[in-house]
Amino acid sequence: MTAHSLRLDHLVISARTLDEGTQYVADTLGVAPAGGGAHPLMRTHNRLLNLWGGVYLEVIAIDPQAAEPADGASPRARLFALDDPATQARLEKGPYLSHWVARVERPKQLGAWQTQYPQRIAPIVPMTRGDFTWSLSVPDDGAFPAWQGAGDGVLPTLIQWDTPKHPSAVLDETGIALKALKAVHPQADVIAAQLHWLGAAHLIALESTDGAAALVAEFETPEGLRTLK
């Protein structure tokens, strides 16, 4: 277990298109995500919604305008399992809360931590979007993080921002706050062990299920309690 507790950075809504994902969030929370931009390396793009306390919500989708690698090389797999046929089949039914991202705060160095524990933490990828740069743990095949074969979006991706400025600091206030992040997983004991090791167990309420893995986020909004799943 790490001695450094992680912080919740953001939640991830996956969608076939940004418009579909934006509409899903707006219909549920009463405010539409905006801003964001493109991730050239991953060939994805996003929109963001500010939440209380330095946390935000990300809607992410494959960017149909993304350029292929200039050197003719094969593009790398997209993050958050967006290239996975199972994910794409699910997105045909609509956007959903697919994942969450936990922040590694300095002085701890995400890259050094991953080098020390490569079986526990996926390879670190440098990312950019506009003026923001950061490091992100992304398996080479673009899958969700996993431990002993269990993941399914319930284990967090790890992020470390390169500058003190965080995206939430430049997003409009919404009056929306995350109340609780919950998950169910058929291998909850394996998931719990990895969350404990990461120092992230305090960020999510985990229960066992005989069914499929799933995430649920509860929000306090000006119109009352709302849920994304």
What would you call each of these model-derived segments?
Residues 2-18, 31:
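Hydrophobic, proline/glycine-rich low-complexity stretches
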Residues 13-15, 104-105, 181-188:
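Short, surface-exposed ligand-recognition loops at beta-strand->loop->(often short) alpha-helix junctions
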Residues 8, 97-98:
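Eukaryotic phosphotyrosine signaling hubs
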Residues 20, 24-27, 68, 150, ...:
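Phosphate-end processing signature that detects enzymes handling 5′-triphosphorylated RNA
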Residues 20-23, 106-113, 188-193:
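Short, conserved charged micro-motifs
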Residues 20-85:
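Glycine/small-residue-rich interface belts in oligomeric ring/scaffold proteins
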Residues 37, 50, 56-61, 82-92, ...:
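Vicinal oxygen chelate
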